[in-house]
Design a protein with these regions (language model features):
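A generic, well-ordered mixed alpha/beta core segment in the N-terminal half of proteins
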Residues: 128-221
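Small-residue-enriched flexible segments
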Residues: 237-301, 310, 315
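Acidic, glycine/proline-rich low-complexity segments that act as flexible tails and inter-domain linkers
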Residues: 48-59, 64-83, 88-89, 96-114, ...
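Intrinsic disorder/low-complexity segments
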Residues: 1-46
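Active-site cofactor/substrate anionic-group-binding motifs, chiefly glycine-
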Residues: 98-152
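Catalytic-core signal marking the mid-to-C-terminal active-site face
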Residues: 48-62, 301-402
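Phosphate/diphosphate-binding glycine-rich loops and adjacent basic-rich segments that engage nucleotide
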Residues: 198-267
């Protein structure tokens, strides 16, 4: 199914709670013509209209499908819709390893009682500026969504809201949650303990660390926000899994085996481990983020981390942190955003190295992907499409349009 290009609005709003509170806004509310859309795509070195893909779906069709599937395994409809929106927002932004790709895995865990479909997500203890949230083994998207709301409310009162999370689950891309405070003119920060250990300590071979991601979201006035979303490994493990599904090889530098030899076949990933960014520096960051998101909150870290790719039944006790900073406590909001615009343009317009077409800032590529896929739909390889159709048949729900 190919979705025709059309005018679209540069606004993406997620309602976290049932009352429909706006907690995320991406870009500025302005129409983008087809001409402008093509200009943006060219800046990415790609004409989306000619990009080859097996299937392409409108985001609303995918959201509806995910909602049907999650409702079929016991999630209340309103909560299934929240999870579906976040999962497909991941796909819209190009995080293909964290979107609908994960649905079969989530369904398996729910059916095996590895996740709680009726969790009592609650605050364990709190102060004016901090809180600890217990997710009761609920879906990570719901747990972190709840926690982001708490952080935003606390930042509104105290200037900062730091919320630690325990007994959560895999929640998708870090950027989704770091961006939630943007709608309140706040800066967002998110950290997490990954849902499986794929890295050893620097110089070791025992898998004691995950890809422990961090994300920052900083609003701008006219430019899209700065959104830095990075794993502490060179590549997130979700990218390895999507490479394997597509039958593609991995670049040298993503993984090595126990003897230090490059590993490029994603189907042999179990024979090696991911490499950290910046060598020992990435190892140090993964360790610190794990202590802040895991150990500090009473969540799993190190040997206690459950590999949710292999174990569908055991509670993962995943730990996360969401932080909101109220810009107005430090600087006039509009002046700050204008200064961010200036910094973005200074970076983008600086002198380029020979052969470099464009200097980008963090989040620019994901924002362009969001524009592209909002216009022409989300691509899907045939293997994933068939997996999802089989899942629909197993659950007794309508599948994707073919």
């Amino acid at each position: 199914v190919r979705v025709k290009s059309q005018r679209t609005t540069l606004t993406s709003i997620l309602s976290l709670q049932k009352e429909g509170e706006e907690v995320i806004r991406e870009g500025s509310a302005q129409d983008v013509s087809k001409k402008d859309f093509r200009r943006i795509v060219r800046l990415r070195g790609l004409m989306a209209e000619t990009q080859l893909t097996d299937h392409r779906f409108h985001s609303k069709d995918l959201e509806a499908f995910v909602t049907r599937a999650l409702t079929a395994v016991g999630l209340p409809a309103s909560e299934a819709e929240q999870v579906a929106h976040l999962m497909i927002l991941a796909d819209l932004r190009g995080s293909d390893g964290h979107g609908i790709f994960r649905l079969p895995q989530y369904v398996r865990r729910i059916k095996a009682s590895g996740m709680n479909v009726r969790p009592n997500i609650h605050i364990v203890q709190e102060t004016e500026a901090a809180a600890l949230v217990d997710g009761d083994n609920g879906m990570g998207h719901l747990v972190v969504g709840f926690s982001a709301k708490v952080a935003i409310e606390k930042a509104g009162r105290a200037g900062i809201g730091w919320v630690g999370v325990r007994r959560s689950n895999h929640a998708g891309p870090a950027a989704l949650y770091a961006m939630m405070p943007l709608a309140r003119d706040m800066i967002g920060i998110y950290m997490a303990v990954g849902s499986a250990n794929h890295m050893p300590p620097w110089g070791g071979i025992e898998l004691l660390l995950s890809t422990n991601p961090i994300a920052f979201a900083i609003p701008a006035l006219e430019e899209p926000p700065i959104v830095l979303d990075i794993a502490t490994s060179v590549a997130a493990y979700g990218k390895v899994k999507t490479k394997a599904q597509r039958g593609e090889g991995m670049p040298i530098g993503w993984m090595i085996d126990a003897f230090g030899r490059p590993l490029t076949d994603p189907k042999r990933a179990e024979e090696g481990f991911l490499l950290p960014i910046g060598d020992y520096k990435g190892y140090g960051l993964a360790l610190v983020f794990g202590l802040l998101a895991g150990t500090l909150n009473g969540a799993a870290f190190g040997r206690d981390v459950i590999d949710f790719n292999k174990d569908d039944t055991t509670s993962t006790n995943t730990g996360q942190v969401i932080v909101a900073l109220d810009i107005a406590r430090f600087s006039p909001v509009e002046a700050f955003k204008r200064n961010v615009d200036e910094v973005i343009r200074e970076m983008r317009n600086s002198q380029r190295m020979h052969g470099v077409e464009r200097i980008r800032v963090p989040g620019e590529r994901s924002h362009a992907t969001w524009l592209e896929r909002s216009n022409i739909g989300i691509p899907m390889n045939d293997t994933l499409f068939k997996d999802l159709q089989r899942l629909a048949a197993d659950l007794g729900v309508d599948g994707l349009p073919s």
